[in-house]
Amino acid sequence: MTLDDDLNRIAEQEKELSFDAFDLTTAWQLGKLLQELATERCLGVAIDVTLHSMPVFYAALPGVTPDNVNWVRRKRNMVFRYFRSSYASGLKLKKDGKTVEDNGLSGDDYAPHGGSFPINVKGTGCIGAVTVSGLPQRDDHNLVVEALALMLAKDLDTLRLAPL
C-alpha cells in the first residue's frame, strides 16, 4: 500500500467509525474492550480514553513503562489539534516532507505516530480521543480501529490497514 492508500483508508475509517451518541458509559465500554483485546493477546499497552480534556478510562498492562504514558499524551494531543488520527497526521507530514516543528509545534508535546483516534459523534465532530501506546505505530492504530469497529458493528476487514 502507498502512503495515499493508507491516508484514504484512514479517512474512510474516521468517517465510518463515528458514533450516534457517546457518553461516559460508552467511553468506559470502549476502554474495557481495548483492555480485554490487549489482555487476550498479551499486549503490553497503555490505553486511554479522554472526552474533551477529561480522562475517562486508563489502563496500563504488563510491559508498559512511563514512556508509554508520555506517548499517549503526545499522540492524543495530535488528535485534539487536528481532529484526525495521529497516524493520519504523521503520514500526511511524511508525504509533505514536514515535521510537527514545521507547523510550530513541539515534538515534546506532539507525536505524529499511530495509536490515537478521534472519537467522532455524527453531527457534532470530534469530542475526544482513544489512544493506545506500546506496539509499533501501525499496530497501535489497528488495535484502536478494531475496537471501534467491534463497538459499532462495522466490517473490520474493509476498514483495517493492510500489513506493511
Curated annotation (Swiss-Prot):
Disulfide bonds: none annotated. It comes from Rhizobium etli (strain CIAT 652). Gene3D superfamilies: Haem-degrading domain (3.30.450.150). Belongs to the UPF0303 family. PANTHER family: PTHR28255, UPF0303 PROTEIN YBR137W. This is UPF0303 protein RHECIAT_CH0003058.
